[in-house]
């Protein structure tokens, strides 16, 4: 029964309750509903803002970090590698996920620079050269012939899902960093 019931239907569904208890249940339900205030703006990212250095846009700063990372990860940026990276960046930007990658890079970079062990990355994110260049993942998708489209596909609009493992003893330190930087209302832990 997936519809909003009329007051009469509700009362009939809970006829085993006395009137006083039923009315209190309705009052409590209304109170809970009034405390829930969620506004979803379609087309607007629910992500926190990543602080972009002056002179960059979100997209251009991501591109800058990716190309810096490519220089560290690969001996040479071949035309094929550049084409793959530009394709991935195009998809990421088109789907509005540049800030997502910057935020993810930020807290992984924090962990790595504070001696907090980070897993090599798992799941479909390992198919992204952008994630590899940013050191979000440590598995070379070119060498292992992994597909980016298994991770992010413009024909299937879903948020990227990057599985990240942190050392259990220091995981709270990373969570505290993210919470302090981006705000408690923007952070949750999915186990």
Task: Describe each PLM feature range.
Residues 1-191:
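Phosphodiester-processing cores and adjacent nucleic acid-binding clamps
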